């Protein structure tokens, strides 16, 4: 018998988010973050429902503008996901 490779297939990397992308916040990633600990204990639902527009990407952070009369926010890029 031939040896078979039983290792799991490599996960595909998600597409990199770029300026202008429509995004929403990943609830699980945000809830476990230091940003959530430093913010209101009940975050607004619109950040998880989306869409928000990614305005600027600097290093590990992105500035998001929501389609509401609220200030833009900076969040870690690993807390953001593509809005679909």
Curated annotation (Swiss-Prot):
InterPro entries: NdhO. It holds the Pfam family NdhO. It is found in: Cellular thylakoid membrane. It is a peripheral membrane protein. GO terms for molecular function: oxidoreductase activity, acting on NAD(P)H, quinone or similar compound as acceptor; quinone binding. GO terms for cellular component: plasma membrane-derived thylakoid membrane. It is an enzyme of class 7 (translocase). It catalyses: a plastoquinone + NADH + (n+1) H(+)(in) = a plastoquinol + NAD(+) + n H(+)(out); a plastoquinone + NADPH + (n+1) H(+)(in) = a plastoquinol + NADP(+) + n H(+)(out). Keywords: Membrane, NAD, NADP, Plastoquinone, Quinone, Thylakoid, Translocase, Transport. Its EC number is 7.1.1.-. NDH-1 shuttles electrons from an unknown electron donor, via FMN and iron-sulfur (Fe-S) centers, to quinones in the respiratory and/or the photosynthetic chain. The immediate electron acceptor for the enzyme in this species is believed to be plastoquinone. Couples the redox reaction to proton translocation, and thus conserves the redox energy in a proton gradient. Cyanobacterial NDH-1 also plays a role in inorganic carbon-concentration. NDH-1 can be composed of about 15 different subunits; different subcomplexes with different compositions have been identified which probably have different functions. Belongs to the complex I NdhO subunit family. This is NAD(P)H-quinone oxidoreductase subunit O. It comes from Synechococcus sp. (strain CC9902).
